[in-house]
Design a protein with these regions (language model features):
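A common structural junction motif
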Residues: 112, 212-217, 261-270
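Conserved PLP-binding catalytic core of the aspartate aminotransferase-like
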Residues: 140-150, 158-217, 221-223, 228-241, ...
Length: 271
């Protein structure tokens, strides 16, 4: 498509940006950064990488997708992220050249409207980063707990896990039944699609409540309809349970929690 567009315009495609999440919140998949960087260099695009769900999470030292996939951070023009995820504070970050960072800073809400977040929250982000830098065992434990959770749920034939193996954010969907196979027809009928989505949510709600009654909190992934209907016509748009592995639990505690989630799923769906 890009080749055709460039040939038709007979000149380089300028002012084009590739914008992507590193770890996608919607389905837990991880983007293949080396391929995107290759595409960026080939067409001379600029790139913005959102590391909200990967900074402080992915990589041996928590430095995100560039570390996990061994990509030079200088190959990414702008790296941004939300500090409310792994760092449990507020605000965000922008990593780039001095010129770009300065532009972002002077055009940010905190500068334009003098609405900076409390100093305590900013300091909390710094402390969180220092803690992660000082204790790399956190990442080892997170990877182990992610593996424990995934291995506990993967054998259940009634579900499918959409997330990448390295992702501690697991999205669990109901495996499509024979009645669901013709999804193209289902998507073409708004009423039938809405009814199908509601029935899926109801089943997931039962699993959610069973786990909660046994002391494990999981949640259904909130779904906001897209302004373009075709964007809701893929595996990522189907209702799912959102389950997050955490380094705050010991491996034994993670196994116990995973067993409860597995038992809740099997109780509702069967093995």
């Amino acid at each position: 498509h890009l080749n055709e567009e460039q040939e038709s315009s007979r000149q380089p495609l300028t002012r084009r940006f590739i914008v992507t999440e590193a770890l996608f919140e919607r389905d837990g998949t991880i983007t293949h950064l080396p391929q995107i960087v290759e595409l960026k260099k080939k067409y001379k695009f600029r790139m913005v990488l959102d590391e909200s769900y990967s900074a402080g999470i992915l990589g041996n030292t928590g430095r995100g997708l560039t570390e996990l996939q061994n990509v030079d951070p200088d190959d990414v023009d702008i790296i941004v992220g939300n500090l409310a995820i792994a760092f449990s504070t507020a605000g965000g970050f922008c990593a780039s050249t001095k010129e770009i960072v300065k532009h972002q800073r002077i055009n940010g809400l905190s500068f334009v409207f003098s609405a900076a977040m409390p100093v305590m929250m900013a300091n909390g982000s710094t402390v969180a980063m220092d803690l992660l830098d000082g204790d790399l065992s956190v990442f080892e434990r997170l990877r182990e707990n992610t593996s424990i959770l995934r291995n506990a749920l993967a054998p259940i034939s009634a579900i499918t896990i959409t997330s990448s193996p390295e992702s501690p954010l697991l999205h669990v969907q109901l495996r499509p039944s024979e009645d669901d196979t013709n999804l193209a027809v289902l998507y073409s009928d708004p009423k039938a699609h809405a009814s199908w989505m509601a029935s899926q949510q109801e089943v997931l709600k039962k699993i959610e409540r069973l786990a909660l009654n046994q002391g494990v909190w999981i949640s259904r992934n909130p779904h906001i309809p897209s302004i373009r209907a075709e964007l809701d016509q893929g595996p990522w748009a189907r209702p799912s349970l959102r389950i997050i592995a955490t380094s705050a639990l010991s491996p034994a505690e993670m196994r116990q929690a995973a067993d409860i989630v597995r038992a809740s799923i099997v109780s509702v769906l069967g093995s």
